[in-house]
Amino acid sequence: MSAVARLCSVGLLLVDLYTGKKIMYPGGNELNVAVYASRLGNESGIIGVFGSDPSAAFLQAVLQAEHVDYSHSRYAEGPCANSTVKIVNGDRVFTGHNNGGVTGMFPIEITAEDEPYITSFDVVSTSTYGRMHPQQVQKLCSLGVPVAYDFSHDAPQEMVDQLLPCVTYAFFSAADKSDVEIKRFIYACAEKGGHNVICTAGERGAFALVDGAMYRQEAEKANVIDTMGAGDSFIAAFLTTIEDPQKDRDVRAALKAAAVFAAETCTKEGAVGHPSPIA
């Protein structure tokens, strides 16, 4: 399939350790989004930090297999980011992490060499777990490419307030809120300068305030095996649809594509697959 959009992720390269099964999977919000974008037929790249442990070679092999460019990523001494996970009734439960490994120790800073690379893309994606300092996210936003930021459910309020006016798309996980609470939250974000605010709510679908209009997207039915990566797949499909330079901007089509792809992701174990014995 020919590429229809170009997406660059900036942030986290991670391995998810399913210790009960002694299996690890590649993961991290930014890796997931980049891989999903590629699988959807787009060109994608990632700027992250590889450690010096065996997980680094594993992650590089996965990115190569998934046709994700990582030529502008960094390398550092220390462990790759990891988290330990168990599955309870099809839902992922994180039981530990190493504080981002080398990503936490050496967060991405945008350099002059990165700028031409980043501006060659149609959209950029990062998140609170990508560990970039707010000033670096603002620098990313200043490059003129639409930037999506996943605040998840636990980003510090100060960071939310600081970055809302900067980013083009603000994503939040809001499954713990009622429908009414989600709408109030979205409008509150807009009052603080949020341009386009999207809240995912698990099996209840998603709510989005995009281009000044409120949308409701129902979740697609799925035989849920593992919800790991559902939010990232939603983001990847939404962004590569709405920012596709070859198509007219269609919010409803982007939300539908996102819901369909997120449901598909939930039918597989591990965010992007590629299981391997824990290194």
Say what each PLM segment does.
Residues S38-R39, C141, E243:
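Gly/Ala-rich phosphate-binding loop of Rossmann-like dinucleotide-binding domains
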Residues M1-K21:
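Positively charged, low-complexity intrinsically disordered leader regions
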Residues C141-A148, S152-R216:
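Conserved phosphate/ATP/ADP-binding segment of small-molecule kinases
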Residues E30-R39:
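Histidine-anchored nucleotide/phosphate-binding helix
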Residues L12-L13, A175, S233:
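Active-site metal-binding loops of divalent metal-dependent hydrolases
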Residues S2-A3, K183-A279:
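Conserved phosphate-binding/catalytic region of the ribokinase-like
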Residues T119-S120, P134-V147:
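Glycosyltransferases and closely related glycan-assembly transferases
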Residues V15-G20, N42-V123:
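Conserved N-terminal subdomain of the carbohydrate kinase-like
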